[in-house]
Amino acid sequence: MRLRAAMIGVAAAALSLSACTTMDGAGATASAGNVPQLQTAYGAVTGTREGASNDVNVFRGIRYAATTEGRRFQLAADPEPWTSARPATEFGSECPQRPSGDVPVFKSWENSVGTSEDCLFLNVWTRGLSDGKKRPIMVWLHGGGYVTGSGSSNGYDGSRLAERGDVVVVTLNHRLNGLGYSYLAGLSDDPKYADSGNLGSLDIVKALEWVRDHADEIGGDAGNVTIFGESGGAAKVSTLMGMEQAKGLFQRAIAQSGSMSLAGFTPRLATPLAKDLMATAGVSSVEELAAMPIDDFVAAMMKSRSKAAFYRPVVDGRSLTRQPYAPDANPVSADIPLLVGTNNNEMRLQGGLGSPENFALTWEQLPAKLTPFVDDADVGEIIAGMRKAHPDYDASDVFFQVATFRNYRNTALRQAERKSKQAAPVYMYRLDWKTPVEGGRLETPHALDIAFVFDNVARSLSYTGPETAQTKRMADLMADAWIAFARTGNPNTAALPQWPAYNVQQRATMIFDVDPEVVNDPDSAERELLQRLLPEGRSL
């Protein structure tokens, strides 16, 4: 048990909380009514038992850091200890954020949780408490870019994954948007704001430290932690792989549909956004920005040039000295195995549901639609090359695939290429199974993989459609591969064809579908064309 020595007195006091409470291990207790209890470094919490066999201990809303109210733009502090057991049965508040809008296919995942600057909470699903078993720990980082989201989505419920693989699942909240990624170091000499550009990532580091320090108590192995995430969560995974502060806190990494851009977001780019936020808020100092009411702060973010959307980690020379896969980056994660991939039609979600006219484009309309995604590349050359590579594609197909490559696949490929030169292996996948929702027009869109990785099809029906033999098959294939990777650093299972590590010679890629297959360099003509003509991709 690696608890802070300063908290020994708190832990001792908690042992005498109730005469009807009995010890069930060094740091966990089980009280009357079979209610699981967990002793943390700061005090005890009580949870629930869930899962198909009622054998998963669940703790929601465990505080891993103190409230940031009154300490905006500053590093997270340890929580104040408590003496009486606190219930951990409800999710903690989310970070204040702009409304995410109504996305019908995400309806099943909605979970109404309030927002507050007191938002540094995590959630745990585990089959054992202080039982001496060294279970792999899987720490999920939520999507939403760096601006929205939380660890409380119904799609992230860890019960089935914990039960299926006997792993520990952890999800968490951290600071987002201007609260977690406003680079203010150039606008104030006060050292307490020196890390303001990367606070969200440093919050995650603090949560990982909590996991390390409580691994025994939650039935896990501090030496076998996998960080995994989708979309913005995958970008956070990539960021952590370049942070010295995170070294040793995880041993494997999975990046789903959101590898970090390989181009740096520097103080030169970040400082003008912070200045614009201050001007929009009507304040002249960082201190005033830190003190203004949170509702006014969020309103100012939404009106500013960033629109509360353009925030990301900053290469500040402190917590992030280089982008993780830049040629001159410090290879702090060279020994970390990586699983990385995308969905085949990512942009049919963002580029389709929000703009339904894109499902019926003409060839005449296509050049103007593609221009925002290709920067200075020759649109005509891209269209001609795509039509040659995919003779059966219509104009909408070309639009969605180029946009998908630009925003997702290219960065995943570049990350895998550079990772393959390091000591630890990298494995590449692509999800091809098509959802029937929206009349099938979404095909294999962004975030569809979440339902299968968590084995949560029943919680994802608005996105996957009804439970069928196919959806069960997809959950079996993907959840078991992710569990295998978390356990051993290798995603191969008996149900999959042999899955080699990725290299630039073969480019072996697992195609996840009802009949999975390994394909070397899938859609090679498309890849060669677009990697030659497009920049390396966008950061989420």
Task: List where the protein language model places each region.
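C-terminal motif of bacterial Sec signal peptides marking the signal peptidase cleavage site
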Residues: 17-19
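Catalytic nucleophile serine of serine hydrolases
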Residues: 229-232, 244, 257
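Short glycine-enriched nucleophile-adjacent loop
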Residues: 234-246
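Non-catalytic accessory segments of hydrolases
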Residues: 21-198, 363, 376, 460-478, ...
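Alpha/beta-hydrolase fold nucleophile elbow
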Residues: 218-230
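Substrate-access "cap/lid" subdomains that shape
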Residues: 108, 206, 213, 247, ...
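Alpha/beta-hydrolase active-site loop
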Residues: 119, 193-216, 272
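Active-site loop->helix "elbow" adjoining a glycine-rich segment at hydrolase catalytic centers
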Residues: 143, 199-203, 231-234
